[in-house]
Amino acid sequence: MKKVGYIAVFMAVIMVFASCFGNKTSNQVAETDSVAMEEEVLPDSTVYGVCGEGTSMHSLELVTDGGDTLTYEVMDEGSEENLVVGGLLAGDRLAVVGYVNGEKEHIASKVINLTTLQGKWMSIDKNFEIQEGGVVKSNIKAETNPWASWKIYNGQLLLNKDTFLIDELGADSLYLENKQGIFAFKRQK
């Protein structure tokens, strides 16, 4: 009778080990980089360059990083959002998102002045500096999730993995919007 008990216990132990080391499926959701997924789906259509001397109220001359000179038509009539944020000043670095219409004209749909965007910005809970080369320097040591990098992607500002629309960009104010709300920053001197 003792042998039957030992055999039953032995079989139970083998079944437990077999269930622990067998093929099992993971219920964990794999973490994915949402920005990397977007980049695979939608390539960045932003054109970078310097604002040219031929820029006027409704015409943007852009000397691209590749050396080409493109002329964009800037049509902001009827648009609810700001088409040009940060202003247009000859010599400033710009990020332009646009398209070519049926008449082979370049039409700008979003223009971001990167020279105006760079600098020190602060709000109630954030104090950071957007620097050249995609670097963000946080000036608050105790910040839980500081931004460390930035880039423009299809006319939107990416701070780390946070994506924002730039609602307004002026000499002393920056308004960023995402699904959590609108965030206001003022330029720190």
PLM features per residue range, with description:
Residues M15-S19:
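C-terminal motif of bacterial Sec signal peptides marking the signal peptidase cleavage site
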Residues F21-K24:
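Bacterial signal peptide processing site
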Residues V29-S59:
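Structural detector for short beta-strands of small beta-barrel domains
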Residues L42-V47, E53, I124-F164:
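N-terminal glycine/threonine-rich, aromatic-flanked beta-hairpin/loop signature
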Residues I112-N127:
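Tryptophan-anchored aromatic micro-motifs
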